[in-house]
Amino acid sequence: MGNHQAVKKLWVINNFSFLDSDRVYSDIFVVGGCKWCLLALPEGNNNYIYDYFSLYLCVPDSEYLPSGWRRRAKVSFTMVNQVTGELSQQQEGVYWFDEKNTTQGFGSMFRLLVFQSSYKGFLVNGEVDIVAEVDVVEVIGKLDVSEESESIDSNGFDVLASQVESVNSLFGKYPCFASKLCPKTPRLKKNVVQSLNEILCKSTKELSNGDLAEAYSALRFVTKAGFKLDWLEKKLKETGKSRLQEIEEDLKDLKVKCADMDALLEFLR
């Protein structure tokens, strides 16, 4: 028996309508001394159900874990209605995870006909938002999990050990944000803080287009919840303008090269 541990995450699936795989995995996270990830089957589990969106919790790389390990976890998945901002269509259950049962969840999480209707609010601009809660209530067997992957409390937020220093710096710079976020959005606070920390700790040049997309999604979500994040919006706008200028410069260079090539081809005729 181990200590009671829980985690709550917001998983944003971008470009859902254009996914080229029948399986989508989230980033790996750690709770209860074990690594986990979320698994979505956009077209359902064809083994026994076809017309539902399926969602599961998995133990990745389970074949490398020592024999005898077990985890009992309470799992809750909630589809977010992006139009109303409400958390709805929730499924939850309690499962044992072990060597033979490494994937548990819901084959009929959401009916596809309803899910794929953009006016219903669950699929907006190709984006799907899922709130996942994993509560590990029993631990049998110790697994070799890096301490950097373990969660540590920082100002009331569970963050990775490797991020404690930078997250403390974030709260020192924006204390009002930390105090507002804690009581109002417990479901999203860990994911939002980690996302903000990653964005703010990077320079403009280090931000990928994927980083920008995730940051805009997080900003829109917390803004609907009532937060005024002018400082984040300002940085994202500046970054977006800078990235657009870079693209325009690249296009100019490309046009020049195309013109030179056309001139060369004309000369060779």
Curated annotation (Swiss-Prot):
TM region(s), chain numbering: none
UniProt KW Coiled coil keyword: yes
A Pfam family: MATH_2
Positions of the MATH domain: 6-134
Keywords: Coiled coil
Keyword hit for Transcription: no
Coiled coil, from the record: 228-269
UniProt superkingdom: Eukaryota
Database matches in InterPro entries: MATH-CC_domain_protein, MATH/TRAF_dom, TRAF-like
Entry protein name: MATH domain and coiled-coil domain-containing protein At2g01790
